[in-house]
């Protein structure tokens, strides 16, 4: 028997959020196995400390077969300021 809440064929995602709170120019990069739930947590002040008190929209996500792949890409995206800037600019169009 599979315990409740256990995902089968689970995928992981690296994602980027853009703050839509007026006057705030912030982005956030993370990883998750449930994009909708994670975005809901960020927007209900139950997400990462740096996202609390702001409203967020999902502007980018990339799907992976393993948690390690998603975490590795998250690290790279967090440190690639050029790519983050391009993704933010693309989201403004």
Placement of each model-derived feature along the sequence:
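GIY-YIG nuclease catalytic motif and its immediate N-terminal context
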Residues: 1-50, 54-57, 61-83, 89-93
